[in-house]
Amino acid sequence: MCRGLSAVLILLVSLSAQLHVVVGEEAPKPEKEICGLKVGRLLDSVKGWLSVSQQEKCPLNKYCENKIQADQYNLVPLTCIRWRSLNPASPTGSLGGKDVVSKIDAAMSNFKTLFEPMKADLAKLEEEVKRQVLDAWKALEPLQKEVYRSTLASGRIERAVFYSFMEMGDNVKLDNYFQPANVEELLKYAWALPMHKKQRSMYDLIGQLVQSSKSPMLQTLHAVELATVVNPELENRENLLNDQVVQLRDNLYKNSFATLVSIARHFPDHFDTLRQRLFKLPDGSKPGADTLPNIVNFIAQLPSDELRLSSVDLLLQSLTAENGTLVQDPEYVYRLSQLAHAMPSLVDVKAHPDLQQSVDDLMAKFNTPIDGKTLQYFQNIGISPSSSVAT
């Protein structure tokens, strides 16, 4: 390998020397001429012009003419014309085009002659370089995969997407590498993937992880993302989310809503999708009267006044009849009175005065007369359902 490299260096030095002879390099002259005029004389003229200008203090914005300087300046091109007419074939010291080409051809022929004996060594050198490069890539490949997986597991999504492009094949091999604890990072990564097939493979892997985790929250997050991502490769995703919503609603009716509250606090975008479906019941159905206290307890646990207000609005929509009034079934009277009584504690209008009008509009829905009773009646019922019967 060293022998081949030395040979290449010798050839380059030889070619450089020959080209140096071809192009030539004129030795500096003690006094150069321009059109037969000494350069020094021209420089002295320029210095004289500058000196006179400084002495006369000619303003920059004013034209100042000096006849002697003008004559000297105009004499230069006339001198060049006269000199060229007297020296039409004066050599310039440089080779003609044909001479340069012939010299280069000769130099290249000499180079080719020197190169022939070294072809075998250069071929060996090329093979050795290829082998070392391939060895380096083989050593780099597992390291690259490890960096890719570690960046993905740590939540550095942009870098993980970059490394995914460097992986071979359409499917990213991540099986048996991640745990359910990595699901949140994997969901962010899957959402960012631009290729539909890779995205589908990643969601399939996440689905396996969330099923093995037995975690309702992870299963819900996975179902919400599948239902909202734009990918024609994904199938049966609406059914998956609908099944998840049915399970969450049943748990809510049974006063078990920790998963929903956790999603509302940590994943507000996912919760917004869930909430719309949670309160939207099939036509002709509504929450049972006995489930309303549990639903109100759930709403009270939501993290913001705006979220609690809009959730109460969605609940009342599910309890609104076709004529725009609240249900008038007797079993809902006391439960609705509890909700009306709890409204001031659900939304703090003193801290959020901008919500006052929305609260007033919502409270107006309770003015629907039920069995001849108004909003004020329901707010004054108290905590005992028997009081509504006695009245």
From Swiss-Prot:
A GO-annotated cellular component: extracellular region
Signal listed as a keyword: yes
Residues bearing carbohydrate: N323
Domain of life per record: Eukaryota
Subcellular location: Secreted
Chain's role: Required for efficient probing on a mammalian host. Alters the local inflammatory response in the host skin following a mosquito bite by suppressing TNF-alpha/TNF expression.
Comment field (misc): Mice that received antiserum against the protein show a decreased parasite burden in the liver after exposure to P.berghei-infected or P.falciparum-infected mosquitoes. Antibodies against the protein are not generally elicited by natural mosquito bites; however, active immunization of mice leads to productive antibody response. Active immunization of mice with the protein results in reduced parasite burden in the liver and reduced parasitemia after exposure to P.berghei-infected mosquitoes. Antiserum against the protein decreases P.berghei sporozoite motility in the murine skin.
Protein name according to UniProt: Salivary protein TRIO
Species annotation: Anopheles gambiae
